[in-house]
Amino acid sequence: YNTTRFTMNIAYLISAHTDPAQLRRLVLALHADAEYFVHIDAKSALSQFASALSLPNVHYIGDRVDVRWGTLREVQYQMNLIRAAVTFPRHFDRIFFLSGMDYPLWSNARITRWLEEQGDREILQGFCMDTDLIEAGQKETYTVARPAFRNVRLGILARILLRLTGYRKPMHF
């Protein structure tokens, strides 16, 4: 178990749906005094994650969401994780989003040093979708998202009709 400790309060918000052993390795590899808020996808068997969820400072988020890629359900589980962290009695200086399949490439000492160098600076990553730097395929993936219905054949037909008519959903930022 990693015993690296430092004065900055960190929360890791983790979403997992598979490989409970990897989730356990991830938590054990990161800062020992951090708090870990974990969402397990509703499609996954919770019992398989018992070992990882029983570690110190690991908080299981009981409001499970059946996450579907490209839908608002992704936002819902993230909001549940954020709510759990901001209502926790401890104040956090840094909050990180991770997947249960992630693993740190840096040592905790290097992560700590880098965070301390950042001071109060917020680190966010994003990009504007309205730019020539983004490939056309990425824009199309965004604008022609998952159809509202689940029938695959109807979804394929809908995409073909959308492409033939030239219709594009407006992008809102």
Name the predicted role of every residue range:
Residues Y1-N2:
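Intrinsic-disorder-associated, low-complexity terminal segments enriched in Asp/Asn/His/Tyr and depleted
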Residues R5-F173:
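ER/Golgi luminal nucleotide-sugar-dependent glycosyltransferases, focusing on the catalytic module
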